[in-house]
Amino acid sequence: MAGDQELELRFDVPLYTLAEASRYLVVPRATLATWADGYERRPANAPAVQGQPIITALPHPTGSHARLPFVGIAEAYVLNAFRRAGVPMQRIRPSLDWLIKNVGPHALASQDLCTDGAEVLWRFAERSGEGSPDDLVVRGLIVPRSGQYVFKEIVEHYLQQISFADDNLASMIRLPQYGDANVVLDPRRGYGQPVFDGSGVRVADVLGPLRAGATFQAVADDYGVTPDQLRDALDAIAA
């Protein structure tokens, strides 16, 4: 089982501001804010519409401070996969509530989502009725294949980038936009900021020498990465 210190690091330590998480996950900051804090919309001539928070965030009086623990950014990472599959986020809440009930309180950051989540969600769709809003949400995420229900390819690709600890909860996330640079978010290294997985060096730490005119080879030798990894990292940052 994961130790108490690691659990605290993943759940209780604020590592990311919303702006940082927005950059790392390639999600609009405003979208992350609604996931972290919920929202209230007041359309003209209609009742107010409220949405509750759907990722783990720690309170802070100003938005410029770190608010997301690692488990929160892991949940947001999976939500972003759902979003990229084309699922309307304003309709996802009933499906998430069903996942939490059947998988656990941090279902989006759980390995059980990868192994059982598609079947769990499909049962929810069947209960909701064919053609219902919840059924359409689930069908946006899941497809039948060889007699089983599996997540669509884009969702599966995101889930495959997550590593899990012995407690079945996320412990590391590979950021796919960095390509072969193999850059990860790991709360145990670099205070959770993007690091090269092989060397543990923060991506931010290699930028200074490169911007100062050092060659790719010199920086690669100094920091234990390859020139190609540096180029991939720079391309991801510039995108």
UniProtKB/Swiss-Prot annotation:
Key words, A-Z: Toxin-antitoxin system
Gene3D superfamilies the UniProt entry points to: Winged helix-like DNA-binding domain superfamily/Winged helix DNA-binding domain
Record flagged with keyword Glycoprotein: no
Pfam families the UniProt entry points to: DUF433, HTH_66
Function summary: Possibly the antitoxin component of a type II toxin-antitoxin (TA) system. Its cognate toxin is VapC45.
The protein's name: Putative antitoxin VapB45
Native source organism of the sequence: Mycobacterium tuberculosis (strain ATCC 25618 / H37Rv)
Organism lineage: Bacteria, Bacillati, Actinomycetota, Actinomycetes, Mycobacteriales
Gene name per UniProt: vapB45
